[in-house]
Amino acid sequence: MVAQKSRLLARAFPYLDIFSVFALTPPPQSFGHTPHRRLRWYLMTGYVFYATAILATVFIVSYFNIIAIDEEVLEYNVSDFTRVMGNIQKSLYSIMAIANHLNMLINYRRLGGIYKDIADLEMDMDEASQCFGGQRQRFSFRFRMALCVGVWMILMVGSMPRLTMTAMGPFVSTLLKILTEFVMIMQQLKSLEYCVFVLIIYELVLRLRRTLSQLQEEFQDCEQQDMLQALCVALKRNQLLLGRIWRLEGDVGSYFTPTMLLLFLYNGLTILHMVNWAYINKFLYDSCCQYERFLVCSTLLVNLLLPCLLSQRCINAYNCFPRILHKIRCTSADPNFAMLTRGLREYSLQMEHLKLRFTCGGLFDINLKYFGGLLVTIFGYIIILIQFKVQAIAANRYKKVVN
């Protein structure tokens, strides 16, 4: 198994096991070589049937929620716009589940390659850092994983049912509400699965940056030709490892593109849908779920903020490399050493061309700048939606006065 080769994956696999229970990702134990091939085949066959059952459950939940939306629209006699928005939002349950299952099926080998690349990168980094005393502070990755992923997972799973159960209305049965909660939590956990891989990349970047800083300290005091050549070889190795991290980020981005794209779309549309119903219930009917709806919208936004924040931190750590290279150039004991000058030039050119972006299929970048733009867009649509509702209510009242 790849977890036996990588400490990072060994600490991330418990979270990935949880995601596999929700049929978001294949079981991590299914990757790698094992002598029990027949047992592995049986387990994977069972998991395929389990994932199919989850998909069928999502279809059922989506269908009956659409029926409930139609009944609620007829009961309250609201506009067809509310019906269309609600049906699209509920249909995204099925669309997101189909996209995720197809992504698992089509990109199964790619995900296995990502695990292998992470394990190989960690092993090569440990080997490259041995002459500098090895890597330090290994416990920090486990702490960051628990703080960023584990704590938010507990808060979200614990709070979502309390906030959304009542707001589903009387047209949804208790059993259907429970299944709907399961589907909603399942879809939101996709963001945390993405965060796990971002944290792994972030840890690899931090380790490589630490090694480069140690190289910079060695260059300050080194004047012997043989030692300078050895340090230049280590610098070149650091450059190649950073290029492999850049390629790893590209593979991770390609794997998560369809599901993260739909998650951003779903959360944005859900916020608009909940604001729409909050407005309807506030001004037309008596509602008891105003604060719950606000907290749900905040939860959906935080669940989008988390991957953007972690990606931005990783980008910032990656962008520190040119500054360290500049320090090496300025503080080296022999800055005119030809091999060092050539190595620094090649490294700097690589940093100019290989930018860490965490792009979502080239449509947008997952970072704080995009999240700010997303907030502006959502608030803009909310303002348009409220203006549309105010005009509709004013027109109806005018007709009543005239009649």
UniProtKB/Swiss-Prot annotation:
Q: Which residues cross the membrane?
A: 12-32, 49-69, 84-104, 145-165, 192-212, 260-280, 366-386
Pfam families for the chain? 7tm_7 (PF08395)
Residue intervals on the Cytoplasmic side = 1-11, 70-83, 166-191, 281-365
- Per the record, the domain of life is Eukaryota
Gene Ontology CC: one annotated term: membrane
Kindly list the cysteine pairs connected by disulfide bridges: none
Q: Report the record's Gene Ontology biological process terms.
A: monoatomic ion transmembrane transport; response to L-canavanine; sensory perception of taste; signal transduction
Q: Which InterPro entries match?
A: 7TM_chemorcpt
- Compartments, as annotated in UniProt: Cell membrane
**Which residues constitute the signal peptide according to the record?**
none
Name the membrane topology term: Multi-pass membrane protein
What the protein does? Answer: Probable gustatory receptor which mediates acceptance or avoidance behavior, depending on its substrates.
Question: What's this protein's name?
Answer: Putative gustatory receptor 98b
Q: Which gene holds the coding sequence for this protein?
A: Gr98b
